[in-house]
């Protein structure tokens, strides 16, 4: 083998070596992106719906004394906070921290509920009770570990775990309320038991529930998701 052939062979070996290194890099990158994509797809699978590009419905598996999995499904993404029972609410225009007591927390939650009601066109349901009372009841429905109660600020009104489970008919075998309207229905049923709703409002809720969410107490995501919101718009 002459010098030129040896040089050519060395060049080929070098190129092959470079290609192997490049292939390893690409393989590693592909593995990385494949894992990243799989992780993203898994996260996307956990986002069981969205409303107007703002409302995310993100499941959170929680262990409670009832032994159930509960799906947060409200206008914002909700995540369980620390052991103190904090609940974090993320809006499209910023991040709010909702705590279980204190005047500042009340202001935050009031702001959140005002935004919530504006987006869902539910202001009419506040005719005969304050937004603070509505806020406490609503947030109470999403607190499995303990009810959110503002007794010093809002009087003696509160909602308990038993109220929530009785209203939603959830049981220890893994049934849960997975939709915004269901959670509002829980609040609605609780308020009915406390005589907080007017008869005219009750009729509207009954109409919505009877037409839209007969099959909503089930595992997973229902195919009637869009129909639920369309039915709500007709009220």
Q: Predicted regions span which residues?
A:
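Ribonuclease/tRNase effector modules and their secretory precursors
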Residues: 1-235
């Amino acid at each position: 083998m002459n010098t030129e052939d040896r040089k050519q062979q060395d060049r080929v070996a070098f190129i092959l070596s470079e290609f192997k290194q490049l292939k390893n890099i690409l393989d590693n990158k592909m593995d990385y992106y494949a894992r990243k994509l799989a992780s993203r797809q898994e996260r996307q699978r956990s986002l069981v719906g969205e409303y107007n590009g703002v409302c995310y419905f993100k499941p959170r598996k929680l262990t409670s004394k009832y032994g159930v999995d509960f799906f947060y499904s409200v206008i914002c993404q909700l995540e369980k906070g620390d052991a103190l029972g904090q609940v974090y609410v993320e809006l499209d225009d910023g991040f709010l921290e909702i705590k279980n007591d204190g005047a500042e927390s009340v202001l935050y939650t009031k702001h959140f509920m005002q935004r919530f009601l504006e987006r869902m066109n539910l202001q009419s349901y506040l005719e005969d009770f304050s937004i603070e009372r509505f806020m406490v009841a609503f947030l109470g429905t999403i607190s499995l570990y303990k009810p959110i109660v503002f007794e010093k600020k809002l009087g003696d009104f509160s909602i308990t775990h038993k109220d929530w489970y009785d209203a939603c008919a959830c049981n220890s075998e893994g049934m849960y309320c997975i939709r915004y309207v269901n959670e509002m229905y829980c609040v609605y049923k609780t308020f009915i038991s406390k005589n907080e709703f007017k008869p005219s409002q009750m009729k509207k809720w009954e109409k919505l529930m009877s037409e839209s969410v007969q099959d909503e107490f089930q595992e997973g995501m229902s195919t009637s998701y869009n129909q639920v919101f369309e039915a709500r718009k007709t009220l």
